[in-house]
Amino acid sequence: MLTLKEKEFWFVVGSQQLYGEEALQEVKAQAQTVTDALNESGALPYPIVLKDLAINADQITNVMKEVNYRDEVAGVITWMHTFSPAKMWIRGTKLLQKPLLHLATQFNESIPWDTIDMDFMNLNQSAHGDREYGFINARLNKQNKVVVGYWGKSEVQRQIAEWMDVAAAYNESFNVKVARFGDNMRNVAVTDGDKIEAQIQFGWTVDYFAIGDLVQYVNAVKEEEIDVLFAEYKDSYDFDYGDYSKDDWEASVRVQASYEIAIKRFLDDGGYNAFTSNFEDLYGMKQLPGLAVQRLMGQGYGFAGEGDWKTAALDRLLKVMSHNQSTGFMEDYTYELAEGKEAILQSHMLEVDPTLASTKPKITVFPLGIGDREDPARLVFDGKAGDGVVVSMADFGTHFKLLINEVNAFEPTTPAPNLPVARVLWEVKPNFQDGVKAWIENGGGHHTVVSLNLTTDQVVSYAKLVGLDYIVIK
């Protein structure tokens, strides 16, 4: 995958000087035990680093300032081991510009009824501290995540891990750079939008390039480079020659290999991690990039067709959040309306993300009726089954809106021998009629990002962090 820089999360444990040095040393020792256990659990995608105990306002403020300017720190996890007066937290919490998780837990899972005394009560009063601390976060409208339960339980660790992925994506949002090869498809409405507002609100940089800029990179690709990549294709996929001669078929595939090399080189040279294409802007290109785009999506680059920069950026963001697992660009195509079998067939003219493949992809070559270019190569496969979320972003003039529809994807049971593109099928929730109606009434686009790895809660958490209006259909 197109990798992130290494990230870590700081663990800030709240207490106060009132309890005395002996008690504070015990708090710190228990905090270290929790930190070590969480890091050794194997359940968390990023490491936790324990910081000094938060026992006064200056200390809290300084650690939050440091979080902001340390790029490797993706967020803060707090735990109120004892009562920690929340006025101490106001300044630092207001300054904090990264995601915050309040872990409402305590060191002991159970109350030791046989030995409990006031010393134990004073040392272990998270129930007391949680409410004081929770109030100030609510008062500050911090949009922090709250995870409740014993820190050693797998369910609690799962929730922390999912939040970590959201926090990592939030940080990456300010590094999303989209290269647009050509403009939006002419006369299409929903794919357009305010790029300046997107950069202000989400941190996304969106740059236009004429297709000739990419053609220069394509022309510079060496045959030896194509040979190496073609050999990789042979090891990774089945080859379906169809009605083409082997020479003609391989010539088409080699064109796509040159595109993959050129696009990747262009993106990496400019620091871009997402891109768009447009079949109306292909001057100097022999084919519409298909296989090339699919391969790059599989490596973690965000993508959307027809110049749809919002979906390309969202694709990159959700790939980071999901570790590029079963997440990719998609388009609503065709309804299945038979009673009891209602579903939506998802595909695209070429560019369906191979992270969604349930079968070994095959490379095929087939004519493309639009774009007026040579027959392009593409990967064909059937999509995975599983519960997931479908996400679309649209610009409503006064604000962006994110639509989130829960779906159940299933593997097709009927062959489609004449369909020369990958296909994904899903049922929308709560049911076909209400789900589709809600999507249309709320202005959901035909371009989406689907993930069979992420949850609604994760996508909503990101939306809250960036102040993004959202609708959940489930």
From Swiss-Prot:
InterPro entries xrefs: Ara_Isoase_C, AraA_central, AraA_N, AraA_N_sf, Fuc/Ara_isomerase_C, Fucose_isomerase_N/cen_sf, Lara_isomerase
Gene3D superfamilies xrefs: 3.40.50.10940
GO biological process assignments: L-arabinose catabolic process to xylulose 5-phosphate
Keyword set includes Iron: no
Listed EC numbers: 5.3.1.4
Record field: catalytic activity: beta-L-arabinopyranose = L-ribulose
Metabolic or biological pathway: Carbohydrate degradation; L-arabinose degradation via L-ribulose; D-xylulose 5-phosphate from L-arabinose (bacterial route): step 1/3
Cofactor(s) recorded in Swiss-Prot or TrEMBL: Mn(2+)
UniProt keyword list: Arabinose catabolism, Carbohydrate metabolism, Isomerase, Manganese, Metal-binding
Cofactor note text: Binds 1 Mn(2+) ion per subunit.
Cellular component GO terms held in the UniProt record: cytosol
Residues annotated for Mn(2+) binding in this entry: 306, 331, 348, 447
Keyword DNA damage: no
Cysteine-cysteine disulfides: none
Domain of life of the organism encoding this protein: Bacteria
GO MF term set: L-arabinose isomerase activity; manganese ion binding
Similarity remark: Belongs to the arabinose isomerase family.
HAMAP family listed in its UniProt record: Arabinose_Isome
Chain's role: Catalyzes the conversion of L-arabinose to L-ribulose.
Protein name: L-arabinose isomerase
Organism: Oceanobacillus iheyensis (strain DSM 14371 / CIP 107618 / JCM 11309 / KCTC 3954 / HTE831)
